[in-house]
Amino acid sequence: WGEPDVLFAREGSFCRQPIQVLASGRWIFANWLCSDSASGLAGDPTAFQISDDQGCTWRTVEMPGSNGRVHANVVELAPGRLAAFMRSRAADFIYRSESLDDGNTWSEPVPTVLPNNNSSISAVKLQSGRIAVAYNPTHTPAPQPGVAAWPGLRCPVAVALSEDGGLTWPMIRHMELGEGFVGSE
């Protein structure tokens, strides 16, 4: 092994998902740009590192209107059409954004019907084409507008399925109903 190289020098780059290889061969790496603040919401936009040469060079694409929408999970709905699902620092809902051009531009995130208490989520495309999201289906009680609400109980755990790229979620199953974990980040 040689000396490690800095892949992304921008301070505050934070990720939770692996690099994904799209049908086009493009690499996309979802992250968010964390900065210190008293409210926990000083920017914190979602961004994507994109490479068209297998990681030799990268460029950054920021998602508009994404402050406080973090830990994007990118799902390739069809070649060139992507959806990103994010947890909410406001502890209200899971948010969704879409790209119709292989990640070059993104829509502003909009809330889904799935609640979120600012705990991590995981979204994947199944072989059937459905989208599955694992999450904690709770809100944080009485969050303050403009201030990050930190997760409380991380239970129950549920999995929701969508047949339309994450626009609707008609199938939800609670997988773990136990007392869960009360944590701070």
Question: Residue locations for each model-derived region?
Answer:
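Asp-box/BNR beta-propeller blade signature and adjacent active/binding-site loops
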Residues: 1-185
